[in-house]
Regions:
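Single transmembrane alpha-helix segments in multi-pass membrane proteins
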Residues: 44-48, 58-110, 134-140, 279-289, ...
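Hydrophobic core segments of alpha-helical transmembrane domains in multi-pass membrane transport
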Residues: 33-46, 79-80, 122, 151-156, ...
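Loop-to-transmembrane alpha-helix initiation sites
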Residues: 29, 143, 185-193, 234, ...
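Helix-loop-helix "hairpin" substructures at the membrane interface of multi-pass membrane proteins
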Residues: 112-118, 127-132, 183-259
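Alpha-helical transmembrane segments within multi-pass membrane transporters and channels
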Residues: 111-151, 295
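Membrane-interfacial amphipathic/re-entrant helices at transmembrane-helix boundaries
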Residues: 3-74, 110-115
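Transmembrane alpha-helical segments in multi-pass inner-membrane proteins
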Residues: 245, 255-320
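Transmembrane helix-bundle core of multi-pass membrane transporters
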Residues: 25, 139, 143-206, 233-236, ...
Length: 340
């Protein structure tokens, strides 16, 4: 009997009792999208080779991709929390435009100090996100309808506030936020992005709030019976999404040297695509910020690759739509196989 127990003890794999390497674990959990990103990069490298000149692998192009990815991924960090809860936020693109316009107007015409103007722009995201979270958590109105309403409200407010005209910003200190470089190499938006990704990952993986988000997204009824305040969790997620959208809006306005009421159109599509490609389930309860990072990189490299290949920009919408459909269908098949 003792010999049997000893044999069973020795037969336990080390990776069951020991802590698995987080990098290896991440790659295993996101194998499909990791391979997809690698294949996409290889295609562009092969394109460089066949053309006899380096286009994709230049430092300037890679930094440009990271700068563009930063705008989308900042939004996608908030969208990840919302989708893990089984919700959706269609207002993110409009909040991007409205926040950028408010910041631009206050700097260009009201001559507010930079910090105050940026804070006011981000405040627009706080108010918009709080509205979404409050209505969704206190009523039975679906998130799709609530955020669709906010999408129109924020976009309309941007047009009214600016008179439907771009607001030019002649401020080097403001333009540095979205167009500057650290040590003449790293784009400033990438620094903000790294901080936001770290904070978002910490919230989701190391805090009680993060555990509650997964619990409510997986089974809201069970979460409620276990003592979790579902309404507070929902409110925070939409508030956080609004703040991330506003930050992205300020960064985008800085990068474009202007606040434009049309800015951010279609950004909700890119954010949702990044989240879904990253392995987050549209049904809720499953997802990782790390997966969203890879998803956003795929979207960024895909957009950049299509531009380098001189493919009409309108095709990008078709490609991204197909990519989202495939990702959602793959998630459906994965869940179906698990049930079997």
């Amino acid at each position: 009997m003792k010999e049997t127990k000893a044999t069973e003890k020795n037969s336990v794999p080390k990776n069951v009792t020991g802590k698995q390497n987080p990098v290896v674990q991440f790659i295993r959990e996101n194998l499909g999208i990791t391979v997809g990103l690698i294949v996409l990069c290889l295609i562009l490298v092969i394109y460089d080779i066949t053309q006899g000149r380096t286009v994709f692998l230049t430092t300037n192009n890679i930094m440009n991709v990271l700068r563009q990815v930063a705008t989308n991924l900042i939004i996608a960090c908030g969208m990840t929390m919302v989708i893990i809860l089984g919700g959706i936020d269609l207002s993110v693109g409009s909040i991007v435009g409205f926040s950028g316009c408010v910041t631009a107007m206050l700097i260009a015409y009201s001559h507010w100090p930079l910090a105050a103007a940026v804070s006011a722009g981000i405040l627009m995201g706080v108010l918009s996100g709080a509205f979404n979270g409050l209505v969704i958590s206190k009523t039975t109105i679906p998130p799709f309808i609530v955020t669709l309403a906010m999408m129109n409200i924020a976009r309309g407010a941007a047009y009214v506030y600016t008179g439907a005209q771009p607001i030019r910003i002649m401020s080097d200190s403001f333009n540095f936020i979205g167009s500057g470089y650290i040590a003449n190499v790293i784009p400033v938006p990438v620094v903000y992005l790294i901080i936001i990704v770290i904070v978002s990952s910490f919230i989701m993986n190391r805090t009680r709030l993060g555990r509650h988000i997964y619990a409510v997204g997986g089974n809201p009824t069970a979460a409620k019976f276990s003592g979790i305040k579902n309404g507070r969790v929902l409110f925070f997620a939409y508030l956080f999404s609004g703040i991330m959208s506003a930050i992205s809006g300020v960064v985008l306005a800085s990068r474009m040297f202007s606040g434009q009421p049309t800015a951010g159109q279609g950004f909700e599509l890119d954010a949702i695509a990044a989240v879904v490609l990253g392995g987050t389930s549209m049904l809720g309860g499953v997802g990782k910020i790390g997966g969203t990072v890879i998803g956003a990189l795929i979207i960024g490299v895909l957009n950049n690759g299509l531009n380098l290949l001189n493919i009409n920009s309108f095709w990008q919408y078709i490609v991204k739509g197909i990519v989202i459909l495939i990702a959602v269908y793959a998630d459906f098949l994965k869940k179906k196989n698990r049930k079997i």
